[in-house]
């Protein structure tokens, strides 16, 4: 008797999981959102390391991430020149309040396009460094009819080893069959519910990350280390970098202009600053990266601007957190 019950339970479990995988409800469940309906849309994509304090969390469902964002609030207005910003944690605004981010600073300038449409900038940055992650987000963003895509990049996003970002892994086009099962999707489904529940305290407080005073401030004195990740001098080879991903992004953008920006960084002047620009980059690697980017931009007709030293080091309170004051972005 017990054996028959166990067997039936197992059969029902397998059948349910197979049906779940066949129906694949994650996409429409992600689009079923209270944001932009009951709660305002978030000004940046959901991401968080301390959900209970930040009223925010990291999840893998792109549909849910975009449904919670203000870009999904309504169809694109006829008088709007829509700009989307793609990039890493500095674009998203790590340790910056929403009104301090690059998108907010640009919106505060009340810019007008040449045809008199009002410029509206949307923050679609997402923490961590990966061109493939950025391209995945860009692909989804194209469904919201941007008139311009601004992609802020830095050398840390280019190594081959960074391309399999967790968001990319979770959104593969052909996952393993068992990865589609309900049993494998339990955490992701729970995260969809949690994102909706956090809408109440977020809408009430406006808090979407923990602004800790205990963060690592940028260092002006550096170690005498000339390595970049696993790479050593003297040569940074093209094969070390995922430059082809930019070509894929241009194809995704299609006729929409894509502006690639080598984002500003803090430049140290203290001990061993003749070896390294900062904690992340030895001079030899970063200099060669800039040369490679300029050459590729010229050869492949990229819209590219190099702002690597546009912001003084004093404007950075941590390595990835420049104060995006309008005097530098105007």
Q: Which residues fall in each region the model found?
A:
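Hydrophobic membrane-insertion alpha-helices, especially the h-region
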Residues: 7-24
């Amino acid at each position: 008797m017990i054996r028959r019950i166990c067997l039936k339970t197992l059969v029902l479990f397998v059948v349910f999981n197979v049906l779940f995988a066949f129906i694949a409800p994650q996409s429409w469940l992600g689009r079923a959102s209270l944001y932009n309906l009951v709660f305002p849309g978030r000004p940046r994509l959901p991401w968080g390391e301390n959900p209970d304090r930040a009223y925010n969390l990291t999840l893998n469902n792109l549909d849910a991430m975009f449904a919670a964002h203000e870009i999904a609030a309504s169809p694109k207005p006829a008088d709007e020149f829509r700009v989307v910003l793609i990039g890493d944690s500095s674009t998203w605004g790590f340790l910056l309040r929403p009104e301090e981010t690059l998108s907010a600073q640009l919106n505060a300038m009340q810019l007008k396009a040449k045809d008199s449409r009002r410029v509206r900038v949307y923050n679609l940055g997402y923490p961590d460094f990966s061109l493939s992650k950025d391209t995945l987000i860009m692909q989804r963003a194209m469904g919201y009819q941007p008139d311009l895509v601004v992609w802020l990049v830095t050398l840390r996003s280019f190594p081959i080893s960074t391309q399999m970002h967790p968001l990319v892994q979770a959104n593969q086009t052909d996952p393993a069959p068992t990865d589609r099962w309900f049993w494998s999707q339990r955490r992701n489904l729970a995260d969809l519910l949690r994102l909706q529940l956090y809408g109440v305290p977020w809408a009430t407080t406006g808090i979407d990350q923990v602004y800790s005073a205990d963060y690592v401030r940028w260092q002006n004195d550096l170690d005498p280390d000339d390595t970049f990740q696993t790479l050593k001098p003297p040569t940074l080879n093209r094969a070390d970098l995922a430059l082809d991903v930019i070509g894929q992004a241009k194809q995704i953008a299609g006729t929409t202009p894509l502006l690639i920006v080598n984002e500003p960084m803090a430049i140290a002047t203290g001990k061993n600053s003749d070896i390294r620009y900062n904690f992340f980059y030895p001079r030899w690697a970063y200099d060669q990266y800039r040369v490679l980017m300029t050459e590729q931009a010229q050869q492949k007709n990229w819209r590219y601007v190099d702002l690597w030293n546009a912001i003084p080091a004093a404007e950075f309170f941590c390595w990835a957190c420049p104060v995006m004051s309008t005097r530098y972005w105007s």
